[in-house]
């Protein structure tokens, strides 16, 4: 996982980069981080992010770099044009990666059920006394 970066939210959600995308790639409440990363290893979209080229994340799924850049455009609340690759990434997650992430989650769940996952358990969230 050299060069890869993930973000983890307090609720256990794991995101594929330094900022939150529309869909988490998994949850530490369900799986260990390595299991989540292993389940998506080789997925071209995440390989592109890891290599520092998010604009290439859709090529294997029919999104050219030009389409990705086009889908990265929006308009600010004041009506000014704005473009950011993170917007394209969010749209790609919404439109394409949802079923891929769900399939990876189902594979991890099946491995757990079959006893093939690591014997270590995810770290439980701490109970906070009020």
Question: Model-flagged regions — what are they?
Answer:
Residues 8-9:
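Short, acidic, Ser/Thr-enriched surface-loop or helix-capping motifs
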Residues 61-104:
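Cysteine-cluster motifs in flexible loop/terminal segments that predominantly coordinate metals
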Residues 51, 92, 110-130:
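Short Fe-S-cluster ligation motifs
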Residues 1-2:
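Short, small/polar residue-rich loop motifs at catalytic or cofactor-binding pockets
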Residues 13, 19-76:
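C-terminal accessory region of radical SAM enzymes
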Residues 15-17, 96-97:
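Short active-site-adjacent structural elements
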Residues 32, 101-113:
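Short cysteine/histidine-rich metal-coordination sites, predominantly Zn2+-binding motifs
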